[in-house]
Swiss-Prot record:
Assigned protein family: Belongs to the serpin family.
The protein's role, per its UniProt record: Putative serine protease inhibitor.
Pfam families: Serpin
Organism: Homo sapiens
GO (cellular component) term, any one: extracellular space
Organism domain of life: Eukaryota
Signal sequence segment: 1-20
One GO process term, biological-process aspect: activation of immune response
Keyword tRNA processing among UniProt keywords: no
Localization in the cell: Secreted
Protein name: Serpin-like protein HMSD
Alphabetic keyword roster: Glycoprotein, Protease inhibitor, Secreted, Serine protease inhibitor, Signal
Sugar-bearing residue positions: 50
TM ranges: none
Length: 139
């Protein structure tokens, strides 16, 4: 569930040949229906998994961390919130590596109740290439 919902969020932002290849690789094309059906399916599944009135404890969370100098399409960020309960957090990956790393890891630690700490570290060499980071965790 974890990796599939993260990849479905990436798929939501893909277009053209990239979207076609992702659809095929993720077997979304075999499910049938429109792309929105896939995202509505994940939305229903995430709501069911994160219910609090169950005997089991299973939680999943999606986070989208974007480079603050990059303009993300409003339709994409709105859809991430609607279907995957993920709001975008704008960070300065390029100029403030340490603070960005701390913010992402704090989010993960909060969502996993401290189970996964220091999952993510940005290397200074890669910072100029980072546009966004998508995080997904389950407890």
């Amino acid at each position: 569930m974890s990796i599939s919902s993260a990849l479905a969020m990436v798929f939501m932002g893909a277009k053209g040949n990239t979207a076609a290849q992702m659809s095929q690789a993720l077997c979304f094309s075999k499910i049938g229906g429109e792309d929105g059906d896939i995202h509505r399916g994940f939305q229903s599944l995430l709501v069911a998994i994160n219910r609090t009135d169950t005997e089991y404890v299973l939680r999943t969370a999606n986070g989208l961390f974007g480079e603050k100098s990059y303009d993300f399409l409003t339709g994409f960020t709105d859809s991430c919130g609607k279907f995957y309960q993920a709001t975008i957090k704008q960070l300065d990956f390029v100029n403030d590596t340490e603070k960005s790393t701390t913010r992402v890891n704090s989010w993960v630690a909060d969502k996993t109740k401290g189970e996964n700490i220091l999952l993510f570290y940005f290397d200074n060499i890669l910072n100029s290439f980072i546009v966004s980071s998508l995080q997904n965790c389950q407890i």
